[in-house]
Amino acid sequence: YFFSLFKALIPKSKIKNLDQLEEFIQTKSAWVSQVTLYSYLKTRMGTRYVLHFDNDEFMKSVNEAKWNIYSVALQDLTFFTFSYLKNNFNFEYTNKSKEIFLKILDNETTNNMPLDIIDKTKKVFDERLQSINWNEYSNDIPFNQSALSLYEWAPIAEELKSLDRKIVLNSVILKWDIIKKEFKERIQF
């Protein structure tokens, strides 16, 4: 308990190489995906939300949402970090973005990420990669797709989601702002 209180005060290690960048992309994408999805579910379901976790049908929906949101978050953060590196550190190896992205996805099979989602994600990544402007991406709205994915995939009734759209999108963007700030402080290529 006390460790968690002081954890925020401990300086985080610098990101100095591609292996550390890969770990950052994976862990922070997972964090944003989980925190935003479960917070939204808890908010919408109220204090008895835990009771719904016994419902297999509901849990199947949550699991599907979790992986789909995470897959888009991975894409967004991968593109953001490499765009930022290119623009601020003259890092020209943006082709490494695909290598790292695929490595993360391959590792997620051990966490039971569904293969159909992995396959779909690889295709979407390639499509986005073809049209990305590395010089603009990190300065534009880099996390819009993952914000939209939470809105799309959250297992919440459509009539309620429509009322929540702006709040849901903003909650994801605010979480990404924390990650962007941390990345800028930790990167040391």
Could you say what each language-model-derived stretch is?
Residues 68-72, 76, 96, 113-116, ...:
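Residues within HEAT/ARM-like alpha-solenoid scaffolds
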Residues 1-54, 64:
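Leu/Val/Ala/Ile-rich N-terminal alpha-helices, chiefly Sec-type signal peptides and the beginnings
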Residues 38, 42, 78-86, 102-110, ...:
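Alpha-helical repeat scaffolds in large eukaryotic proteins
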Residues 3-10, 22, 98, 102, ...:
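Residue-level detector of alpha-helical secondary structure
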Residues 40-90:
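N-terminal interaction modules that seed assembly of large macromolecular complexes
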Residues 106-189:
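Helix-driven interaction modules
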Residues 50-53, 86-100, 113-117:
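Short acidic alpha-helical/loop segments enriched in Asp/Glu that coordinate divalent cations
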Residues 61-65, 98-112:
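Eukaryote-specific, cytoplasm-facing alpha-helical/coiled-coil scaffolding segments in long proteins
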